[in-house]
Curated annotation (Swiss-Prot):
Belongs to the NrdI family. It comes from Lactococcus lactis subsp. cremoris (strain SK11). GO terms for molecular function: FMN binding. Pfam families: Flavodoxin_NdrI (PF07972). PANTHER family: PROTEIN NRDI. GO terms for biological process: protein modification process. NCBIfam families: nrdI. This is Protein NrdI. SUPFAM superfamilies: Flavoproteins. Probably involved in ribonucleotide reductase function. InterPro entries: Flavoprotein-like_sf, RNR_Ib_NrdI_bac, RNR_NrdI.
Length: 140
């Protein structure tokens, strides 16, 4: 299973480089088309007010990528990265993409992940490659 990922500070890129999975980086300058199943790994940059939470503009490339030529139709699941110190907006972008496209949020980790996180994502990818089924549950 291929990983499609977006990295702002390099944390997500460092995580992906620790896996043995094929991958492609989402950048603001590309129109990247996916024609095979993939897992999306996205960090979260969001703002929160008393009435609304939303991803900030720096995350637009993730939303653009998912919409481009219906890439979202090939996405088998979403993995969120973030910092738990941000409490209510921890992995918010992953939750927002999951809800928008009704794609399961499958896993989350902090910063650039631990060896256990790498193993868990590789196992998850292998299970999906072997036909494991997952169901959507709205994370918001």
């Amino acid at each position: 299973m291929k990983l499609a990922y977006f990295s702002v500070t390099g944390q997500t890129r460092r995580f992906v480089s620790k896996t043995d999975l094929p991958n492609v980086e989402i950048t603001p300058d590309d129109d990247l088309e996916m024609d095979e199943p993939f897992l999306l790994i996205t960090p979260s940059y969001a703002e929160e007010s008393p009435t609304v939470s939303k991803s900030i503009d720096v995350m637009d490339p993730v939303f653009d990528f998912m919409a481009y030529n219906d890439n979202y139709k090939h996405c088998r699941g979403i993995i969120g990265t973030g910092n738990r110190n941000f409490a209510g907006i921890y992995i918010f972008t992953a939750k927002e993409v999951s809800a928008k496209y009704q794609i399961p949020l499958l896993y989350d980790f902090e910063f650039n992940g631990t060896p256990a996180d790498v193993a868990a994502v590789e196992k998850l990818a292998a299970q999906l490659d072997q036909g494991a089924k997952v169901t959507f549950k709205n994370p918001l």
